[in-house]
Swiss-Prot record:
The chain crosses the membrane at residues 161-181. It is found in: Cell membrane; Secreted. This is Secreted and transmembrane protein 1b. Disulfide bonds join C38-C55. It comes from the Eukaryota. Belongs to the SECTM family. Interacts with CD7. Residues 1-28 form the signal peptide. One of its GO terms (biological process) is immune response.
Length: 212
């Protein structure tokens, strides 16, 4: 009887300990790592562009903290912010389920810097984004200044007209002179005839050429 009592009293604590270990194991299995997956850490945009930085984790987000670090100072933009939609100055933060998004609709120089994120799900995860805001590479077409091509001065126009008239007059006068000269001094055709008593084709005896 004593042996049975001792055995029973020793078995119960062992079973209780085993159940506690099993519960702890199941709880640890359910609490998976957050494993954040984020957009590109290096972001470079032109001034006025829209910027979206986002992170997803494996568990629902409890809160998010975002700081902007520049060479001059460190500013806390959102601090331990729970799920929801928030806006501060020109920053917008959207937290829903496993995702957090930071949106800048009109990027300016003041938005440049290093964004330090603290994502709190089951654990605390830290992520960094570096945002560089550049001046626009080129102006929009409608913003380009229109340069009017200056008209030619009147003096230049008159000079060109005089030169053209002089060339045309020279050509006309030359043509008229050639025509008149041809009419006054026509080219006389040559007639070849053989002289009697001369042997045609004799060496050294040419034909006699007479004018008409």
């Amino acid at each position: 009887m004593l042996a049975y009592s001792v055995t029973s009293s020793g078995l119960f604590p062992r079973m209780l300990w085993a159940l506690l270990l099993l519960a702890a194991s199941l709880n640890a299995h359910n609490d998976v790592w957050d494993e954040p997956c984020c957009t590109e850490h290096e972001v470079s945009v032109n001034r006025g562009s829209r910027v979206v930085m986002a992170c997803n984790i494996s568990n629902n987000l409890r809160d998010v903290t975002i700081e902007l670090v520049t060479s001059e100072k460190t500013s806390i933009i959102f601090n331990h912010t729970p799920p929801g939609n928030y806006s501060k100055d020109s920053w917008q933060l959207h937290i829903q389920g496993v995702q957090a998004q930071l949106v800048i609709t009109d990027a300016q120089d003041k938005h440049s810097g290093n964004y330090s994120w603290k994502l709190h799900g089951f654990q605390a995860e830290f992520k960094n984004f570096n945002l560089t805001v550049n001046a626009a590479d080129r102006q929009k077409t409608e913003d380009l200044p229109v340069t009017k091509v200056p008209d030619k001065p009147p003096t230049a126009v008159r000079t060109e007209v005089i030169i053209i008239i002089a060339i045309a007059t020279t050509i006309i006068i030359t043509g008229i002179g050639v025509f008149v000269w041809y009419k006054q001094f026509p080219v006389a055709p040559q007639i070849q005839m053989s002289v009697p008593c001369l042997i045609h084709g004799s060496p050294g005896i040419p034909y006699l050429t007479l004018p008409p």
